[in-house]
Every structure is written in structure tokens, then in C-alpha cells.
Amino acid sequence: MKKIWIVAAATNLAFSLSAQDSGVETQAIGVVIDAHAIVDVVDDEIVFDFSADDPAEAGDPFVLGSNKNQTTYLNYSLMLSNGGIDDGMISVRINDMNEGMHMTLLADSSPLASHDANQYGTLGTVAANFDAKIGASPVILNSTDQVLIENIGSSYTGNGAGNGYLLSFTAHINDYSKLDADNGAQDMGTITYTIAE
């Protein structure tokens, strides 16, 4: 029995001597971050209600009142998958706009002015043709995607009203002969925002 104990102790000592730590140790680490691209507008629906804008006198036209101007905020979160090239973008298009009307859009990045790049990342710039800060003329939306925000790196705008890009829409009459009343129901169109890299 004594021999077995001595053999076991010697074996244990041999293993513990070979497994001793050295003065330097390395350890592998892994970090997993999924690429993501999420875009949102604060208001799921913008209603241009012109029911109070009927002409008061015979012979007067129907004229769009103050409700022709509406605003909302565009928010996004983007994690690039391409090694840090700031090539993300958000495009915009409109479908099923009321006949006889069109919609224009301007975007303003002023709400992002205080966002620190170390915290929020590389925020995108408003495409020059949409940029309200440089005095661009409002862009007519159509069914073709148009680049609204460009040069987006891995970043996020913050969520909700007051965060992101201020979008200013204006409704216009472009063909009075095609206008028709909706009798209290609203005609529905769709504005689509697409974020991609």
C-alpha cells in the first residue's frame, strides 16, 4: 500500500511541475458583432389633411393650406460588414401619390450636430440635392430610389423625435384637373426608405 502511495505522489508531482505557469501567458479572445441595418421614421403615417381648405367663394380654387407642410425624424442604426468603408446610404421613393399632386422633400442634419463621433460613430451626410442646410431646392419624390443620406459608417442616430435627420415634406398641386375628393376617407400613398451598404 505504501508503494502505491509513493508512486501516486511521484506521478502527481511530475504532472504539477510540467504544468507550472511561466512569466508570460497569452489567451485568445473572440468578439462577435452582427452586421445590421435598421431604418425608422418617428411617425408611421403623415396625414396631409386639407378638409378645411375648401374655397369660400364661387370661382375660387382649392388651395393647399398650412397642412401642406409636415415634418418627421429619420433614425437609423448601421453596423458595416465591409471593413470600415463608410459607404452606407439611405434612399427614398414614393408610390401611389394622389393624382394631380406631388411631394417634395428636404432633409436637415442639424439635430445630429452635437453627436460625438466616438459615441455615435460616423454619421451619414445629407445628399447635396436634399440638404436644407445648404439651401437646396426641395426634391420631387417619385417611384425611383433617390439617395437621401450617404457616406454612413458604423453609427446610430438616437431614437425618436429630436434625433436623427429632420425631414420636411411639402405637398403640391401639379395638375388641378386630376384632383378628386375623397369624401372623408384618405387616399394612401407610401414613402419607402431603404438602408444599405
Where are these regions (language model features)?
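N-terminal small/polar-rich segments of proteins
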Residues: 20-133, 138, 145-197
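Sec-dependent N-terminal signal peptides
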Residues: 4-16
